[in-house]
Each structure stands twice: as C-alpha cells, then as structure tokens.
C-alpha cells in the first residue's frame, strides 16, 4: 500500500513526470525544486505568468495580495492562495487547490483539488487529489531525535533515507512518515503514526475500521 501506484492518481497533477520510475512517493521529495525549474519554462506563457524567478502562476489562479510566494513554485489553474499564505518554495499547488489563511507550505506537491484551508503547516509532504486538512492540522516532518524517518506498515518497516518526511495523502495531526490511503478519514484530535489502509476510518490507534 506504500507505492506510488497504490496511493496516487497521477492524472490529477501537473507533476506526474516527477514520480516516473519511483517506487515510493517520498522518493520524489528531494527532486521537487529541480523539477519545478525544469517544468516552469515549458509552461505556455499565454496560460501562466512568471512574476518572479522560478515562480509560475496560472493566469486564472486567485492569489491574494498578502500571500507570499517564494520560488521555486508552480501554482496551477484556478488554485486559490488566500490571505497571508506563506509558500516557502519547492511547492507545486494543483488545479483548484486551496492554500488558506496563514498556511505554510515547504517542499510539497499538492495534487488537484487539495484543500489546506486554515492554519495548516505542510512540509516535505505529498497530498493526493481531494485530500483535505482540517483547521489547525499540521504535518510534522522531523523526528525529535533527528534520525532518519522510517515508514511503518504493520510489522514492515521501510527506510526512507531522509531526515524530513511529513505525510503522504495525509490529514489531521500527523507524525513524520505517516501514510494515509485514499478515501480514508481521520477523527479530529487524532495523532496518527504509521499507515492507514484505503477506505478506512481512523478513530484512535486501537480503532481503525473499514468503511461500510
């Protein structure tokens, strides 16, 4: 359940080629910035503005004046970047995605229709299409002891080789290296670690139920 094919629909992102040849989604994290620098100059100028170095913004995206957008960054069609959003760089924001008030992004891919609407931090993470983060949700991306992040699925442990891995397709409060399968839900106030299968409901660490 940890592979790109298991977790992500590459038809729902401008960054599909970023994941080519990769087994696990987090393998793309170290390449996001360079990928943007390659892709940006190829985007049609009649559709994308180029307001700053390594920044490309679709002409039909809505960007509030108080938002900060640092490069490298691509903001795709009809995305909305709201008041005081802080994009630190190496960020791809998908079609019709929402980056809300005081949300901070760093080294991320938001697939199409992702919503990070209220006071979220998303770092070193990949959020699949239609993923929604509740108000105040964060993706912790560094372990307290600074050791390399390991993804856990049951008894299996998959080393990432990285000190910084946030969440893959995640929402709510997530610990480093959290993976949540498509169409799963997490109860508010949860602290999630490890892997949640597709089509499940996470109530707490002892209660993970299949959707009916």
State where each predicted segment sits.
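Glycine-rich hexapeptide-repeat left-handed beta-helix
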Residues: 15-17, 101, 110-113, 117-212
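Glycine-rich active-site/cofactor-binding loop and its immediate structural neighborhood
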Residues: 57-102
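Right-handed parallel beta-helix
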Residues: 60, 77-78, 83-84, 95-96, ...
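Terminal amphipathic alpha-helical/low-complexity segments used for targeting or macromolecular assembly
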Residues: 1-54, 199-200, 205-212
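Short gly/ser/thr-rich secondary-structure transition/capping motifs
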Residues: 43-48, 60, 116, 155-158
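Glycine-rich beta-solenoid repeat tracts in large extracellular/virion proteins
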Residues: 68-69, 86-87, 104-106, 121-123, ...
């Amino acid at each position: 359940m940890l592979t790109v094919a298991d977790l992500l629909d590459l038809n729902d992102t401008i960054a599909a080629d970023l994941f080519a040849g990769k087994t696990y989604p987090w393998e793309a994290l170290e390449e996001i910035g360079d990928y943007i620098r390659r892709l940006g100059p190829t985007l049609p100028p009649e559709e994308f503005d180029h307001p700053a170095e390594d920044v490309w913004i679709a002409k039909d995206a809505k960007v509030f004046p108080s938002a900060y957008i640092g490069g490298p960054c691509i903001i795709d069609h009809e995305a909305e970047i709201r008041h005081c959003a802080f994009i630190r760089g190496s960020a791809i924001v998908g079609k019709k995605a929402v980056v809300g008030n005081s949300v901070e992004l760093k080294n991320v891919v938001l697939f199409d229709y992702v919503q990070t609407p209220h006071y979220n931090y998303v770092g070193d993470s990949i959020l699949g299409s239609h993923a929604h983060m509740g108000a105040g949700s964060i993706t912790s991306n560094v372990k307290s002891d600074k050791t390399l992040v390991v993804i856990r699925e049951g008894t299996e442990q998959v080393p990432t080789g990285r000190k910084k891995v946030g969440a893959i397709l995640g929402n709510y409060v997530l610990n480093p290296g959290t993976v949540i399968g498509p169409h799963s839900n997490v109860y508010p106030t949860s602290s999630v670690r490890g892997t949640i299968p597709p089509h499940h409901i996470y109530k707490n660490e002892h209660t993970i139920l299949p959707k009916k």
